[in-house]
């Protein structure tokens, strides 16, 4: 089946021609909110408990919702199908998913602790802080993609990257990184998993597993949910790594709530349509921003004509996506005034929602990263990140253009009161 069909029918929990649909079965998967489940015999319950403790995806009998929930499992199966993976494991948030990846890879099956992580900047600010702070006992080496292989040591347990990267939209050649890692494995004598945060691309535009990565990580809060009303994270991977991730989830407790699982499951059905329509809007805005005199730089895959980006848009990623970032020519104060001068676009963190969101990463999503590290990874204070939604692209451009032009003319955000329009306010943090 083609991707769009799988997105709809995997999310409904049956194949399109399943006769059961005509036998009084629910058309939409239900929500199982139970925290615990009864059992007939202690021995049967013990067998099921053992299977879940070992990280199995299913057991003969459900035991406890922290170990397994049918609603969440339905979402996991559907996402794995779209990613071309053996399995996926869902978590309460994207950060819970990333944390589980770091923990699971630090303690592989051979029992040797490998807490060293090789990572490529930029990444999401929370991920950067998790690795840099050593909060869960990890040590990180930040390197350029070309230097990943040389940075791998005997105690390296993970290579982590984002592509496109948050918030610069920098693209990394996944195949090339995987090849460097596999080359280094011969030197150190063990496998080093490669995890790719593919949140910006979604399974619609990119499948890291098919490119050789071991794990494809998502903040499901973003595009997978798509409406700004559900939080979650997920890792698509092999069944071997899925078992390890389920064991981490079982002990740390970062489980996805069943209602969130239901909403994410539902969100997959419209994911291809949303991603492509949002991408079409983003293309238009990126091109217009690149030609606006108040804008000094636009970051959007392919717009600069960079040969690597153009090649990866042919061989790795099936489109640029719908997130872009741009720098305001007059600096950080001017960037602030642009944001505060907007009337339609929502001032809020997060991304991937049906409405358009804007924020300054250096002040919000990447504030936790050291200032020097932010600058070095291409996140200056005058950079604005725009997650493009499903509104009319002309309405979005009119809003951006009036805010940019007001700043260019030196009026700033006082244009709001001059037009008698109160700015939209978001309570999102």
Would you name each region that the model predicts?
Residues 15-19, 87-294, 299, 414, ...:
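Conserved PLP-enzyme active-site core in the AAT-like
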Residues 283-355, 369-375, 414-423:
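Conserved small-domain helix->loop->beta segment predominantly found in fold-type I
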Residues 7-28, 32, 333-373:
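C-terminal core of ALDH-fold dehydrogenases
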Residues 263-273, 322-329, 385-389:
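Short, well-ordered beta-strand elements within core beta-sheets of diverse protein domains
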Residues 1-59, 412, 416-429:
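N-terminal glycine-rich, Lys/His-bearing helix-loop that initiates the first secondary-structure elements
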Residues 148, 331-337, 392-398:
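Short, conserved charged micro-motifs
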Residues 30, 41-96, 126-133:
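Conserved N-terminal alpha-helix of the aminotransferase class I/II PLP-enzyme fold
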Residues 86, 141, 183-184, 340, ...:
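PLP-dependent enzyme catalytic core of the Aspartate aminotransferase-like
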């Amino acid at each position: 089946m083609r991707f769009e069909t799988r997105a709809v029918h995997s999310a409904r929990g049956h194949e399109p021609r399943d006769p059961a649909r005509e036998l009084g079965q629910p058309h939409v998967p239900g929500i199982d909110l139970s925290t615990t489940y009864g059992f007939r015999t202690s021995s049967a319950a013990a067998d099921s408990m053992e299977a879940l403790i070992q990280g199995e995806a299913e057991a003969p009998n459900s035991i406890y919702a922290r170990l397994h929930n049918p609603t969440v499992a339905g979402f996991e199966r559907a996402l794995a199908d779209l990613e071309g993976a053996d399995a996926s494991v869902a978590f309460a948030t994207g950060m819970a998913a990333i944390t589980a990846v770091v923990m699971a890879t630090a303690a592989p099956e051979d029992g040797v602790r490998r807490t060293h992580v090789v990572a490529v900047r930029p990444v999401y600010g929370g991920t950067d802080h998790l690795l840099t702070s050593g909060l869960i006992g990890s040590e990180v080496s930040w390197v350029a993609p070309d230097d990943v292989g040389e940075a791998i040591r005997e105690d390296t347990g993970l290579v982590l990257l984002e592509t496109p990267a948050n918030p610069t939209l920098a693209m990394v050649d996944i195949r090339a990184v995987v090849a460097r890692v596999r080359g280094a494995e011969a030197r150190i004598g063990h496998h080093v998993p490669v995890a790719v945060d593919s949140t910006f691309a979604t399974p619609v535009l990119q499948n890291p597993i098919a490119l050789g990565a071991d794990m494809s990580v998502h903040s499901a809060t973003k595009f997978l949910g798509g409406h700004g009303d559900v939080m979650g994270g997920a890792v698509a991977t092999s069944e071997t790594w899925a078992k390890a991730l389920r064991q981490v989830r079982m002990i740390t407790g970062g489980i996805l709530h069943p209602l969130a699982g239901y909403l994410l499951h539902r969100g997959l059905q419209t994911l291809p349509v949303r991603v492509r329509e949002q991408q079409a809007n983003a293309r238009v805005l990126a091109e217009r921003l690149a030609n606006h005199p108040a804008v000094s730089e636009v970051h959007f895959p392919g717009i600069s004509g960079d040969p690597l980006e153009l090649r990866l848009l042919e061989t790795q990623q099936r489109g640029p996506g719908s997130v872009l970032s741009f720098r305001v020519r007059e600096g950080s104060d001017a960037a602030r005034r642009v944001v505060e001068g907007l009337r339609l676009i929502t001032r809020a963190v997060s991304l991937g929602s049906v409405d358009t969101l804007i924020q300054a990463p250096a002040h919000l999503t990447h504030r936790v990263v050291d200032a020097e590290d932010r600058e070095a990874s291409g996140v200056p204070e005058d950079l604005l990140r725009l997650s493009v939604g499903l509104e009319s692209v002309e309405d979005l451009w009119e809003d951006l253009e009036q805010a940019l032009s007001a700043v260019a003319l030196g009026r700033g955000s006082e244009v709001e009161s001059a037009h008698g329009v109160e700015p939209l306010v978001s309570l999102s943090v």
